[in-house]
Swiss-Prot record:
Keyword entries, A-Z: Methylation, Ribonucleoprotein, Ribosomal protein, RNA-binding, rRNA-binding, tRNA-binding
The protein, known as: Small ribosomal subunit protein uS12
GO molecular function ontology, one term from the record: structural constituent of ribosome
A biological process from GO: translation
Domain of life from the UniProt record: Bacteria
Single GO cellular component term: small ribosomal subunit
HAMAP family according to UniProt: Ribosomal_uS12_B (MF_00403_B)
Family: Belongs to the universal ribosomal protein uS12 family.
Function comment: With S4 and S5 plays an important role in translational accuracy. Interacts with and stabilizes bases of the 16S rRNA that are involved in tRNA selection in the A site and with the mRNA backbone. Located at the interface of the 30S and 50S subunits, it traverses the body of the 30S subunit contacting proteins on the other side and probably holding the rRNA structure together. The combined cluster of proteins S8, S12 and S17 appears to hold together the shoulder and platform of the 30S subunit.
Pfam families: Ribosom_S12_S23
Quaternary structure (record): Part of the 30S ribosomal subunit. Contacts proteins S8 and S17. May interact with IF1 in the 30S initiation complex.
Species assigned in the record: Geotalea uraniireducens (strain Rf4)
Length: 123
């Protein structure tokens, strides 16, 4: 515990905010190239095959990112846009791929929450 004199001389050190998506380096999104597209299994109470991709970003950082929605067209060397946002039951996955931009097509036959999945308005 510091004395009052020490606080007057030095003061308190302010806490630094820790970023939840450090690889984006304060950008809202970042572009990258898929190096590996694969499926992985979630943590304990859940069971599924979640689609994920390893992406090398334009700043040289390689991250694991989640591919949302039903079905995708991504493969190695696909150029994708990454946004922040973790997947709770996949450890180490802190980013989402933005559907409907660059090489990633929107989800087919999507009626609700279309903007989140890059789906066009049905006729």
């Amino acid at each position: 515990m510091p004395t009052i004199n020490q606080l007057i001389r030095i003061g308190r050190e302010s806490k630094k905010d820790k970023s939840t998506a450090p690889a984006l380096k304060c950008c809202p999104q970042k572009r990258g190239v898929c190096t590996r597209v694969y499926t992985t299994t979630p943590k304990k109470p859940n069971s599924a095959l979640r689609k994920v991709a390893r992406v090398r970003l334009t700043n040289g950082v390689e991250v694991t990112s989640y591919i949302p929605g039903v079905g995708h067209n991504l493969q190695e060397h696909s150029v994708v846009l990454i946004r922040g946002g973790r997947v709770k039951d996949l450890p180490g996955v802190r980013y989402h791929i933005v559907r409907g931009t660059l090489d990633s097509v929107g989800v087919k036959d999507r009626k609700k929450s279309r903007s989140k999945y890059g789906a066009k308005r049905p006729k």
